[in-house]
Amino acid sequence: MKRYNPSEIEPKWQQIWANDARYRAVDFGDKPKYYITGMFPYPSGAGMHAGHFLEHSIVDTVARFRRALGYNVLYPMGWDSFGLPAENYAIKTGKSPKQTVPENIANFKNQLQRVGASIDWTREINTSDPAYYKWTQWIFTKLFERGLAYQKDSLQWWCPKDKTVLANEQVIDGKCWRCDSVVVKKPMKQWFFKITAYADELLAELPEMDWPDKIKIAQRNWIGKSEGAEVNFLIDCKPSDSLKFTPELAEKIKAGAKTNTIRLGAKNLAAGDVAELMMRDGDTVESFGYAKITNAQKLPLKKVPNNMPGHESYRDDNEKLADFQKFYGNDVTLDSVVAVYDFEYIPPITVFTTRPDTIFGATYLVLAPEHPLARMLADGDTQAAVNAYIDEAVKKTEIDRTNDTKEKTGVFTGGYAINPANGEKMPIWVADYVLGGYGTGAVMGVPAHDERDFAFAEKFELPVVEVIERPEDDTSAEQCYHGEGILVNSGAFDGTRSEDAREQIVAWLEQEGVGCAKTTYKMRDWLISRQRYWGAPIPIVHCPVDGAVAVPEYDLPVLLPDVDDFVPRGDGKSVLAAQEDWAHTTCPKCGGPAMRETDTMDGYACSSWYLLRYTDPHNDQCAWGTKQVNYWAPVDMYVGGDHATAHLLYVRFWTHVFRDLGLTEFAEPVKRLVYHGLIQAEDGRKMSKSLGNVVDPLDVIDQGYGADALRTFELFLGPITENSSWSSRGIAGVYRFLNRLWTLVQEYDESDKSAQVNLKKLDSLTHATIKKVTDDIYRLSFNTAIAALMEHVNDLYKLKTEGFSPAWRSALETLVQLVQPFAPHMAAELWRQLGHDSQLDFVDWPDFDDAKIMQDTMTIVVQVNGKVRAKLQVATGASEDKIKQLALSDESVKRYVVGEPKKVIYVKGKLISIVI
């Protein structure tokens, strides 16, 4: 008898499959399409461990199943090879990532080929290939054209170990998602994608998506939509004088573009004074804030620079003189003495609140330490304390700052604001529990109706004013009431219910010009630039004349240059900044000298569109053909176990943009998402090289178990959505199952097939198994499908004691077909042994006939006082008395039934209910 030898069978079939391009997908085929893939791996190390292979086992099993069902299946593969993981591995090994990445890809590919993954390798992609990232850069330029890619100065998360900024999604519990280092905030000019512009769309689509609830909840919470009002609290300043401006100049002041003014007549202003800023529009004059005078000087008009920063520029003195004569008359000359005032704009403090109905109870304001007014509002008495507090606060992680179990800290700025609702003065504080990156970076303190505000007010002895009446039936012992109710101490709104008051107060704020209805999002725009080498260069040049200019398509890709030293500098700049020959270029717009952007794109940029590139991977004229992408995509099933709010949000955002650009007919990239659990090490911990508990899949294969046993075992461990642990005994058990199946076919093949067997019984077992396995694979309940196959093999072994007959061939052929998605190598070999030349992969999946399934037993649930205490397997047709007797004699039931029961009720074929 030929023994089961995976080391002989598996390489043989892998070679056959490779030679005839068995799994090559056909564009626009006659069969219905089915596009399935997993999250492509980043080849950052020496290879994948057994835990990584769960994803590929799931995908390959479904792909093979769908082919057998008659689908034109697309199962592609690619490599997420740009980014920190690959670069850090290269640094660790002392080689360039341009060398390590191809080496790692070759190893990863070998692993996938050795487990028999039915991948269409003709569609293989690699994100660090210029042919790929050319189109990543092209997509960037399209986003830039639509205002969805922009650069700004802001405080950003900085990883001191990886020496780069991180997106909000890449900071977990105050630590870097890659290296677990504590991150800090650092002021930097960075590139962003405006994902917030699509927040409502991304939120609106979630309910209808066939994605796991936990992922949809995570994305909903991450987007964090809040509806309320934005309220402007004017600073209570004592101005020494006023400065009037046109509406156009007022807008420039608010935007920070205008920071000085030149007046013919001197104002009553000196350095350190405050000026009230007035906007004059015709006969209307109204205040729009204040400004702190930082410098005041008098000098002849001719001495005023024509290109003074923060002021309108002039071509020459003549244009400057003409401008001043327009305002002040022809008596003005270049020798006329003018007053020049430099100032810092002090805008109103804008606060977002979801509870505008509580504004009359706001008794103080709190600014985040990062708020631009935090230091400016401090006066001589408080400056030192405010500066010291801010310097310490910004060193803390957000987790520490928002920990409600810690005592609140803060510092009074010395400044006051005016509550627009009641005109009351409100002290302005700085406190670290308010975060600069969320909302406006300022909150109104309503201590009577917010626990956090109450704790702060209690510590610093700030007033508490109740404006929502506590309901009479509220018996809670909490010192502040944060529910809804009837307004009190709220002026004209007294007696109004909260839900009505919110709408009325917002309308009143809008009428008064001090607020408006506002929807905000917790989600911030996607920080895309990285100060690292190994990434797609950002296709922007900076021109002193034209500013930031996108590189035109005909100059793409902007190639990543070869560098000798790619270790991050740590100074906030990429190593590309030192590549002067590469960085110096010409402006595509004016042809003048310009500098390339030296930051690279986060690896998530390349992984946000690869699912669409798979549909047309060799197209060198565009990112994909519209016919191909609209035939294959959206992805029918996408499998992974990571990136709930990063990649899975970004890929949705980009696809929505592609729809708006007319590049796709759909907005959502994935129809069904399967989010699997982890396979942990035998010790119950996550597999990790540092812990020394990694299981190498090739070691498992080479130990003699083979790839089929590895694949089948990983799917047999338990429900794929839950975590499980590797088991050496478990894989040995799965190998024994496959060996028994193999042996069963060999015994049949060598028998004389002359026995008389119970064909009805054989048919019943076969059709029951077809039904069970088919249903379980559809439901992705692979562990129960494999268990059913194991049980079926056991049943066949019992039946074969009667001997083999010709009818066994059909039963064994069906068994081989059913096991094929899990153990394809062995199935292909057995199919050949059973006399078939056809390719098993494309043989029609077997159908079941309910009429042939004999129900030899039935399950009876036994309840005691309504609680399930046992489940009995009884013969079909057993009498009621017999079933009652079995129920009362069951050990699990006897523990709960003492003496004679009051009633024993039998529901035919389903239930025994015992009442005691």
Predicted regions and their residues:
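Residue patterns forming the tRNA-binding/recognition surfaces of aminoacyl-tRNA synthetases
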Residues: 3, 12, 16-20, 92-238, ...
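Basic, alpha-helical terminal appendages of large translation-related enzymes
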Residues: 1-33, 254, 288, 331-342, ...
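Amphipathic alpha-helical
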Residues: 201-226, 368-411, 556-586, 812-844
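Helix-rich, typically C-terminal accessory recognition domains appended to large enzymatic cores
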Residues: 80, 146, 150-157, 234, ...
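N-terminal catalytic cores of NTP/NDP-binding nucleotidyl/phosphoryl-transfer enzymes
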Residues: 26-95, 101, 124-139, 354, ...
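Structured alpha/beta reader/binder surfaces that contact nucleic acids or chromatin modification marks
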Residues: 239-346
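Catalytic alpha/beta core of large soluble enzyme barrels
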Residues: 59, 72, 371-476
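Long, charged, mostly alpha-helical binding arms that flank functional sites
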Residues: 4, 228-230, 469, 480-507, ...
